[in-house]
């Protein structure tokens, strides 16, 4: 049992270090990916850890959980206002972690719950992304109440690799779409992010909507407006001929409302 307690303590300390912070929105997103053969076993223990952490710090953790459609892959997402705050979190964890572990130690059957989670869960690691505000449209979302934000349950995630045209060509094309959308009255929620450390993609675009059905309908409406514009068509044909990026992967993610902290 002592060995199990030490393993559990180390895991909890590491997890709390990753996911405790007290900022409502930031320039950096930490995205932790894991697969679960048994969501109930995984999330029961994780829910205990995060709920206890929230109780200890006395504030919302501003963390949300998503599940990839038709998959056992999950993503835990939280934000930092700056890289310095990411570093400062390590210092805060020295005080928070022992309190969290002490409270969890008193939970009935905690060893069994932890071992069940450990057996069911395969962690894939964390990625840190920087938001590029000038290539994003998140202000309307940030102005919403927490209840309004919960209505936006769907995320379309597109991972891009750059072509030989280079980064400036990719960003110039993104800027063209943004400017064109403003002229055409096209408005939707999206965030363009760049990995802080090297990953399997150069950029990540996240599009927000209330459901996958709403996303596809709104996407179709947007494209109809865009293709009605001569300048947009000319740029589209140019990029089709000489691409500035290629799609590495696309995800359809749904918010798990019961696991918001």
Feature roles, as predicted:
Residues 1-28:
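Bacterial Sec-dependent N-terminal signal peptides
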Residues 26-230, 234-261:
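Short S/T/G/P-rich N-terminal loop/turn motif that feeds into the first structured element of a domain
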